[in-house]
Amino acid sequence: MPTVSALRASLETYRGLGDRPADFGSFWRRRDAAAEACAATSTATELPSKNLLAAYSRVCVASTDGRPLAIRVIEPCTPGPHPVVVMFHDLGRGARGWHHMTRFVALGYGVVALEARAWSTDVTEGWELGPRGLAFTQVIDDALVSAHLALSLPWVDASRVVTWGEGLGGALAIDVAAVLGKRVWRCAAANPMPADFRGAWESGFEKGAYAGLRTHFRDVDPTAARADELFSALAYVDAMFFSPALESRLLVGVGLDNDVSAPSSQYAAFNRATCEKALISYPKWGHERINDFEDELLGFLNDRQADKSAV
């Protein structure tokens, strides 16, 4: 078993398996345009929790497939414009509570948090139809709609938009920031997944966002005869192929003792990013909320560099 130092050293240069599809950028530009159009029409319901610091509302907006999305919005009560954190939650967990999200108001931030729709959580769903048929493509579409909603809010400082998420939400934070380019100021992700689908499969990761791969290669393609076709479709929703397009600053936290989101795949997404970036790894932490990283996030949002740079 490798030492922590040896593991870190090997991960620092790992870039994952496979190549970015040639039409990846144009594919997501088209979908982003559709997401932006959806965000232009929404209905907000104000909640009775307003206080001296913040006002709360739930916004309903149709996604690119016409299905309704619910998005939580917290607006600081002090005069704007305000920076905003666009939040995405992990697989199997709901959006964070209003009380938790209100902490960002202390830093002067508003919050826009997508309540992700129910879906199968099988990343292979729809693969036979190519990237347009993937259920996870729609998940990313939904995330883009929520980001465009944030950009459209009159109190938001459009020059200080942050994407942030954990686990699946971490990958969505990277994906959205990559598609929006210069429109995102900061991007932070903890234990982001999925990324490096083929690498995760080859390494035997079969939990979380990768669980569908095990089922697929047991029930649908037991000899892996069509593996290349599957991974060609999944390349369009792979955070590892979004990250090279990032133009924001990037902060990533990785629990090295993670048996749900492959540390190697997380590093692959980070290592392919060419923007200003920092990664903090935690040898004895797994796929869980890491308090130390949340402290680093606080500093990242407070416009200072993360004070650790170990990878």
Language-model segment annotations:
Residues D175-A224, S281, R289:
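Hydrolase active-site cap/lid region
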Residues L256-S261, E288:
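Acidic catalytic loop of the alpha/beta-hydrolase fold
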